[in-house]
Amino acid sequence: MKKVTFIFILLMGILGGIIYYNEKTYSPLNATDFQKLFPNYRGNVDKIYDKDFIGFSFHNELFELYLYKMMENVSINENYPKFEEWEKNEIVNKKENSSTWKKCPMDIKEKEKFKDVIASEVFEEDMHGKNFRTILNDTNNYYTYVYINELEYYFFLFNKDKGELYYIRKKGW
């Protein structure tokens, strides 16, 4: 009986370790995604922060913030990105549903599109959420997005001075 209990606890510990490792190393952006965003960038990227503001959900809802550090200089090409699809969603109306890199701050019309995230109270409780708002108003920075509908969109904010990319995923919340 003690042997069975020990093996069970050992297996649960190993399984817990694997789940923890997968959670900590998960990144929604891969090298191909960075090539879409920054076509000439070949450097390394480190995920330095991630926050899931909803937690576990049975309804596939997302509200997540990721912060990446670009390890080499990035040049912004205002003709990119050219999204054809994003996270398995085909972009049908490219002019309305996606954007090339634009200089911050956002105009009133686009702020209205993303108001539920930009004005979200959960950002007040998170250091990087607060920084996101500050960086969004700095004229030296850039943003772009993929807008599926008011319940699903993906927002990118690039802090040029620090070489950091904020990535927000929002779906169904």
What are these regions (language model features)?
Residues 4-5, 31, 119:
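A sequence-composition feature that detects small, non-aromatic residues
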Residues 10-11, 15, 29, 37, ...:
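Generic detector of leucine side chains in alpha-helical contexts
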Residues 15-93:
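N-terminal export/targeting and maturation segments
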Residues 90-173:
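Extracytoplasmic electrostatic interaction patches
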